[in-house]
Regions:
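Select transmembrane alpha-helical segments in multipass membrane proteins
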Residues: 11-22, 85-98, 132-136, 190-203, ...
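Alpha-helical transmembrane segments and their lipid-water interface positions
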Residues: 21, 32, 60-63, 89-93, ...
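Loop-to-transmembrane helix boundary motifs in multi-pass membrane proteins
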Residues: 10, 15, 130-134, 221-225, ...
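Short amphipathic alpha-helical coupling elements at transmembrane boundaries
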Residues: 68, 75-82, 89, 120, ...
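Lipid-exposed faces of alpha-helical membrane segments in multi-pass integral membrane proteins
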Residues: 23, 27, 47, 51-55, ...
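Helix-loop-helix junctions that connect adjacent transmembrane segments
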Residues: 3-10, 45-46, 122-129, 156-283
């Protein structure tokens, strides 16, 4: 695909970059820990995944439909304000914005944690780790001050790189799959309904970010067409990666060991391919964190800009640079993070 076909007009992102924003923001650090949490329930967790995917699919369809009807930046905030008024819109914008920049701090810390595999000096040194995490936040803030296209390129590259370990385990990992790890199907001692409900709740937070492409809609080429396609494609890619890779890990590692694993994907890779594969997973996890950080930092500037344009946030948040970047919201949120 040519550069022009993906970007449309200058300064906007196309289908692939919008899709990478969805996939990249969804697949942060959490997916690399989720198999251990689900191992407490056993193979029945696959049903929790399926119910959660079904619910996320309906939610994605709602966002896709709304993005065709309301072509303005802001995503969930804009849709809430349009449907329920200024007060509801403000509450959604305020709560969502806080969740973004506070979550960014956690993502940065998690990314530094994975980097410690390669840089032992980060282990047991909270001050150094904090400084590196702060540095990561400001590095991606700097990237986000350049242009939406540059942010999109970084997002696309990090997304492609970080899904490689998930694809490897979600495909080749099944060559080492032991079906006995799924017997009995329910390890929790609870009823099947309770186990499925619990695993669905655990899986649900892995789908945070499916709405990402709707927020910078005025920076998306032909948004009424691109955003629905990117949202559905991004959700589908992430869901397939989640289910395949998680089931593979559960089939590789004995349930009793998996429940206590601090790095289930790395442990599974080590069992299958050796120590070098564990390092590959750690690198993928670090890139996953920093790729998600890049995408969420983009949104931390776009959301308050949309609210400021409609006089629900201070007008200064609507100011943009020559590149069309809402620099005040971007910088202020990074300071808070």
């Amino acid at each position: 695909m040519s550069q022009k076909s993906n970007s449309g007009e200058t300064g906007k992102i196309g289908f692939w970059m919008s899709t990478s924003l969805v996939v990249g923001n969804m697949t942060g650090s959490g997916i690399f820990l989720l198999p251990a949490a689900l191992a407490l329930y056993g193979g029945i967790s696959i049903f929790g995944w399926l119910f959660t995917v079904l619910g996320a699919l309906f939610l994605a369809l709602v966002f896709s439909r709304l993005s065709r009807l309301i072509i303005r930046a802001g995503g969930p905030y804009t849709y809430a304000r349009e449907g329920f008024g200024d007060l509801t819109g403000f509450m959604v914008a305020w709560g969502y914005w806080i969740s973004i920049w506070s979550g960014n701090a956690a993502i940065a810390v998690a990314g530094v944690g994975y980097l410690s595999v390669f840089f032992p000096a980060l282990k047991g040194n909270p001050m150094l780790s904090a400084l590196v995490a702060i540095g990561a936040i400001w590095l991606f803030t700097f990237i986000n001050t350049k242009s939406i296209r540059k942010v999109g390129v970084v997002q696309l590259l990090t997304t492609v790189i970080k899904i490689v370990p998930l694809i490897l385990l979600g495909t080749l990992g099944f060559l080492h799959f032991n079906k006995e790890h799924f017997v009995p199907l329910n390890l929790s001692g609870e009823s099947g309904f309770d186990a499925i409900t619990a695993t669905a709740a655990l899986a649900l937070w892995a789908f945070l970010g499916l709405e990402s492409a709707t927020i910078p809609s005025d920076k998306v080429d032909t948004p009424e067409r691109t955003i629905p396609r990117a949202t559905m494609a991004g959700l589908s890619i992430a869901a397939l990666l989640y289910i395949a890779s998680t089931m593979a890990v559960m089939g590789i590692i004995v349930p009793a060991d998996l429940q206590h694993s601090a790095a289930p994907f790395a442990d599974a890779a080590r069992l299958v391919w050796g120590e070098w594969a564990s390092a590959l997973i750690a690198a993928g996890a670090a890139i996953a964190c920093f790729g998600a950080l890049n995408g969420w930092i983009l949104l931390q500037g776009q959301l308050p800009m949309a609210a400021a344009r409609e006089k629900l946030f201070p007008a200064s948040f609507a100011r943009v640079s020559k590149q069309g970047i809402p620099f005040l919201g971007l910088l202020f949120a990074s300071v808070l993070a």
